[in-house]
Amino acid sequence: MNAHEALAEIAGKMFGDNAKKVMMVLASNVEVSDEDLAKDLKMDPPELRKLLNDLFEARLVKYRRARDENIGWYKYYWRITDEPIQQILSDRKRLTLSILEKVLSLEENSETYVCPKCGTRYTVDEAENNNYTCEVCGEVLEPFDNTHRVEKLKRAIELLGNWDPSPKQQASRAIPHA
């Protein structure tokens, strides 16, 4: 799998099939305007622009803006990023670990309540403010045992913490050890 195919796979996992299709079109071109992309992929232009912006925020694509002298508007030309995939993945790993660790801390250090009927969760303060009744359906709230969630978060942090996005590490995983 080459770098562009890998980026397309990543985009597909993050944003869905349309993102993968966009990345594949961009991989076969130097630059493509969002208008041409929309035509090629038969996508609604505003939907495509939102997807391109999501891909840009994820650092998977870049753009160049040029003024159309005839109408005075800007045209945007998109291309696949030139950043190393490993750097993008390492940064995303770091960000994801940070978020997971914050969520774990909240889960371990706070008491929550849940509605047995509709499943809405409440912090202890929210539960107290509502007299331990659900705002949605009026049921009496029950303490929520988040032990399972805490264990899942710890496992996810462990797995992600041990994951190395470098090509050398990925190649060694593909080869069975004797």
Curated annotation (Swiss-Prot):
Pfam families attached to this UniProt entry: TFIIE_alpha, Zn_Ribbon_TF
Keyword set, alphabetical order: DNA-binding, Transcription, Transcription regulation
Start and end residues of each HTH TFE/IIEalpha-type domain: 3-86
Example of a GO MF term: DNA binding
Keyword Transferase listed: no
Gene Ontology biological process terms in this record: regulation of DNA-templated transcription; transcription initiation at RNA polymerase II promoter
Domain free text: The winged helix domain is involved in binding to DNA in the preinitiation complex.
Protein's job: Transcription factor that plays a role in the activation of archaeal genes transcribed by RNA polymerase. Facilitates transcription initiation by enhancing TATA-box recognition by TATA-box-binding protein (Tbp), and transcription factor B (Tfb) and RNA polymerase recruitment. Not absolutely required for transcription in vitro, but particularly important in cases where Tbp or Tfb function is not optimal. It dynamically alters the nucleic acid-binding properties of RNA polymerases by stabilizing the initiation complex and destabilizing elongation complexes.
Family: Belongs to the TFE family.
Complex formation: Monomer. Interaction with RNA polymerase subunits RpoF and RpoE is necessary for Tfe stimulatory transcription activity. Able to interact with Tbp and RNA polymerase in the absence of DNA promoter. Interacts both with the preinitiation and elongation complexes.
Protein name: Transcription factor E
Organism: Thermofilum pendens (strain DSM 2475 / Hrk 5)
